[in-house]
Each structure stands twice: as C-alpha cells, then as structure tokens.
C-alpha cells in the first residue's frame, strides 16, 4: 500500500495543475452474504485469525503513514458509522456504499461530517434512494450516536457516486451513460441540493468488475463532458480501482495484487491518469 502511495504521490505532482487525487485506503469490505475477507479492520494479518482491536490500530496507522509519508489525502468507506470517531481526524473523504446508502444512521452521520461524503446508488440502481440519502445528509439532523443525543448542521458536500447496478436477472446495468448523467443532474436541480457533483465509479457494476473496462468508461465519460456543458460542470471526477499489479488474487501471493476487487495495475493506472490530464489540457 505504501509503495502504491509513493507512486501515486509522484504522479499527483506531475498533474497537479489539472487533477487532484485522493487515495482510496479502503479498510473495510462489505460482503453480499457475509463471507470472505472483510478488510484490514477485521483481519490486519491475513495469515491469522480476525482481530478487530488490532485491525482498528492498523487502520489508523495506515492512514497516518500514507498522509505523513506521501502528502496525499485519503478516502475510506464508512461501512461502520460507529468507527468514524476513530478516523475522523485522518480521513478526508468518506464514501457511503451501495448497501448502506438507504440506512438512516449512515445518512445522519454523514450529515455531521466536515468533509465530502460520496453516496453511491444502491445495487438496484434506484437513483431516488441515493438522492434521498444525499438530501438527508445535506440537512440538519438530530439522532443518537455513541449513546448521546447529537445535532448536526448538515453536510453541503454530500454528493453522487454512480457505480452501476444489477437487474433482477443478475445482469450488470451501467449508469455512466449520457442519458443517466442528465437524469441525475435534473434530480439535483429539482431537489435544490447544494454543490451538484457527480463521481463516476469506473469499476463495480459499471464495468462488471472487468477492470480493464475502466479505461473505456473514463474515455466515454470525458467525451460526454465535451458534448454537454451541464455534464462538464457537474461530472468532475472518477473513482478508479487500481493497485500495483493488474487483476486480483484469492491469497496474498503476488506483491501489489488486490485480494478483493480486480484492479488496474500501475502501468495502466499511470497511463490512464496521463490520458485524462492530456484531455483536460486540450
């Protein structure tokens, strides 16, 4: 992870006048049926039994080292809202995942975070669910948190992440297309939400977890931005899954290869960022 962070930091410096990168340091992995590796917070050493106490320490240490040793800011998924207090002083960007976006606690906690919170559409693809979550996060809330009654002022930086969907037949339905983007922008306008901002998640159900498809998705989205001024103004980022080696593996045997979702390797990542930079510089 730190080797990847060092490379990303060097690349960030090359493109800093057009691109701002936040490194995904995802430490908890949601599981559809509860099985499988659940991330650093659960199992900091994959050769040993799960240990949440050691995992929480490892999470803080990893975020801290990435930030202090590379100068990058970090992002993490807020899978467990109760853990926010353990990383709130370190993490600069929080994501609410597809399986959590409809949950009231996630929405209300997001309303009290003083950092951007990206909210993904649910796996069904229902944009209304996601926008209701953003509305809740952008407004004042009163609720119980860590055994205390808390009030929030709302988070004006809560925004959209489009990650694709799965239909009732189990087939992927991408939602980074031109018409979907315009639909999302119209919903932003109709609901009067602040700071309209859309991130495209280039993996997951947009790519069908075919990690090389991320390159095509980025290219098509950049074209859509060129064709429509509203899209250009609102679609302002990508969430790209990348690591040192292409693909994924079941066990940590190959250095720098993901043991969760398949990722772009470093060479492809660097080339893609440079391509984005060149497109934005035209």
Give the predicted meaning of each segment.
Residues 2-187, 204-220, 224-237, 242-252, ...:
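Active-site-facing alpha/beta catalytic cores
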Residues 194-197:
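Short, structured loop/turn "capping" segments at alpha-beta junctions
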Residues 250-263:
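Acidic, Ser/Thr-rich peripheral helices and adjacent loops at domain boundaries
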């Amino acid at each position: 992870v730190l080797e990847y962070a060092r490379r990303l930091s060097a690349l960030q410096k090359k493109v800093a006048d057009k691109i701002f990168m936040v490194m995904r340091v995802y430490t908890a992995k949601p599981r559809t049926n509860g099985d499988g590796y659940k991330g650093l917070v659960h199992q900091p050493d994959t050769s040993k039994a799960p240990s949440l106490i050691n995992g929480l320490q490892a999470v803080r240490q990893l975020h801290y080292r990435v930030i202090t040793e590379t100068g990058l800011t970090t992002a993490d998924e807020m899978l467990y809202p109760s853990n926010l207090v353990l990383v709130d002083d370190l993490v600069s960007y929080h994501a609410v995942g597809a399986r959590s976006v409809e949950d009231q606690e996630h929405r209300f906690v997001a309303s009290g975070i003083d950092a951007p919170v990206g909210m993904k559409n649910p796996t069904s693809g229902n944009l209304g669910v996601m926008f209701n979550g953003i509305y809740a996060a952008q407004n004042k809330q009163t609720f119980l948190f860590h055994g205390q009654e808390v009030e929030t002022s709302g988070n004006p930086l809560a925004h959209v992440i489009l990650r694709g969907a799965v239909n009732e037949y189990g087939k992927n339905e991408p939602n980074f297309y031109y018409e979907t983007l315009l639909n999302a922008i119209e919903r932003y306008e109709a609901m009067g939400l602040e700071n309209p901002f859309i991130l495209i998640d280039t993996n997951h159900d947009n790519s069908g977890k075919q990690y090389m498809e991320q390159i095509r998705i980025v290219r098509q989205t950049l074209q859509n931005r060129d064709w429509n001024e509203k899209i250009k103004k609102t679609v302002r980022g990508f969430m790209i899954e990348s690591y040192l080696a292409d693909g994924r593996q079941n066990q940590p045997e190959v250095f720098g290869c993901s043991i969760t979702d398949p990722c772009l390797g470093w060479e492809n990542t660097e080339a893609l960022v440079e391509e984005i930079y060149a497109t934005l510089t035209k």
